[in-house]
């Protein structure tokens, strides 16, 4: 995870201070990239403890095509609470776009099912892309997608994934995003008979909120520990068939959690 820590240090010391939508203020840079070889360990931060249950439940929630926080609340995950309406709805956010993208003609496309089939049948395709940025739906979303487009790539029996993230909350959000897409890559590789390759994380506006500076300094003062291992315990027919108990994380020995406020 040295690439993440180097980026955290770069933004903290070289970033440009800017006003932002939330009113908190940020220090940001534009256009950065990190690479993680999933064969070298699961990229979950060890310089602070992350809540792996929340990351996994959120990913399974996306893959269900769900956009109501009911499932998350049932599983004690609160990361979307601030954006949901009184009924728990968020509008046509990630899960809706992944599983039920609505075209101009009214037809819907299950992008996850499509890309899984393409990986199996046409692995050299350059069109192994899933997008959550449906321009017509953006005004209806409680929060437009931050991690908005990902592409798979098959080579040498390994499945790699590149994510483009337009807005990257470096202290709170990005560590979740790294782990989530590393999980998704591992899961997709498992069901398509491949091994996990690289996760490539491309960031647009990468920023630290002004009320995260002290927390970032504390994290940078800590020595990284060995990465954990992510195990998939069961074979399933499709990536959308996975359940929470199908996974196991071993040898995760992080430093203590660092609390920081969420900018809404």
From Swiss-Prot:
Any GO BP annotation: dTMP biosynthetic process
Instruction: Give the binding site residues for dUMP.
Output: 21, 126-127, 166-169, 177, 207-209
Main location per the UniProt record? cytoplasm
SUPFAM superfamilies according to UniProt: Thymidylate synthase/dCMP hydroxymethylase (SSF55831)
Which Pfam family, giving just one, matches this sequence?
Answer: Thymidylat_synt
Q: Does the keyword Thylakoid apply?
A: no
User: Which InterPro entries does its entry note?
Assistant: Thymidate_synth/dCMP_Mease (IPR045097), Thymidate_synth/dCMP_Mease_dom (IPR023451), Thymidate_synth/dCMP_Mease_sf (IPR036926), Thymidylate_synthase (IPR000398), Thymidylate_synthase_AS (IPR020940)
Q: Which reaction does it catalyse?
A: dUMP + (6R)-5,10-methylene-5,6,7,8-tetrahydrofolate = 7,8-dihydrofolate + dTMP
- EC number(s) per entry: 2.1.1.45
Q: Which UniProt keywords apply?
A: Cytoplasm, Methyltransferase, Nucleotide biosynthesis, Transferase
Q: Which GO terms describe its cellular component?
A: cytosol
Q: Where in the cell is it found?
A: Cytoplasm
GO MF terms listed in the record are: thymidylate synthase activity
Respond yes or no to whether keyword Repeat is given for this record: no
Residues recorded as binding (6R)-5,10-methylene-5,6,7,8-tetrahydrofolate, renumbered to this chain, are 51, 169, 263
Protein's pathway: Pyrimidine metabolism; dTTP biosynthesis
The active site annotation covers 146 (nucleophile)
Subunit structure, briefly?
Homodimer.
Q: Which family does it belong to?
A: Belongs to the thymidylate synthase family. Bacterial-type ThyA subfamily.
Q: What does this protein do?
A: Catalyzes the reductive methylation of 2'-deoxyuridine-5'-monophosphate (dUMP) to 2'-deoxythymidine-5'-monophosphate (dTMP) while utilizing 5,10-methylenetetrahydrofolate (mTHF) as the methyl donor and reductant in the reaction, yielding dihydrofolate (DHF) as a by-product. This enzymatic reaction provides an intracellular de novo source of dTMP, an essential precursor for DNA biosynthesis.
Kindly give the HAMAP family that the UniProt entry links to this protein.
Answer: Thymidy_synth_bact
UniProt-recorded name of the protein:
Thymidylate synthase
> What organism is the protein native to?
Rhodopirellula baltica (strain DSM 10527 / NCIMB 13988 / SH1)
Which taxonomic lineage is given here?
A: Bacteria, Pseudomonadati, Planctomycetota, Planctomycetia, Pirellulales
């Amino acid at each position: 995870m040295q690439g993440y820590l180097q980026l955290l240090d770069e933004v903290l010391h070289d970033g440009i201070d800017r006003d932002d939508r939330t009113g908190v203020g940020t220090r940001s840079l534009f256009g950065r990239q990190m690479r993680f070889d999933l064969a070298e360990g699961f990229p979950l931060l060890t310089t602070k403890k992350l809540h792996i249950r929340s990351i996994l439940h959120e990913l399974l929630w996306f893959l269900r095509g769900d956009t109501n926080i009911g499932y998350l609340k049932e599983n004690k995950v609160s990361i979307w609470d601030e954006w949901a309406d009184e009924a728990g709805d968020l509008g046509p956010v990630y899960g809706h776009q992944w599983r039920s993208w609505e075209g101009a003609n009214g037809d819907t496309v299950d992008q996850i099912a499509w890309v899984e089939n393409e990986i199996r049948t046409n692995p050299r395709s350059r069109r192994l892309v899933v997008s959550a940025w449906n321009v017509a739906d953006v005004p209806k979303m409680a929060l437009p997608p931050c991690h908005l487009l990902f592409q798979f790539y098959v080579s040498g029996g390994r499945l790699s994934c590149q994510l483009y993230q337009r807005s990257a909350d470096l202290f709170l959000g990005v560590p979740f995003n790294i782990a989530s897409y590393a999980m998704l890559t591992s899961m997709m590789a498992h069901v398509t008979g491949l091994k996990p390759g690289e996760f490539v994380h491309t960031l647009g506006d990468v920023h630290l909120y002004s009320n995260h500076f002290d927390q970032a300094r504390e994290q940078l003062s800590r020595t990284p520990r060995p990465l954990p291992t992510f195990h998939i315990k069961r074979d399933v027919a499709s990536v959308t068939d996975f359940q929470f108990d199908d996974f196991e994380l071993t040898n995760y020995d992080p430093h203590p959690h660092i609390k920081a406020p969420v900018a809404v």
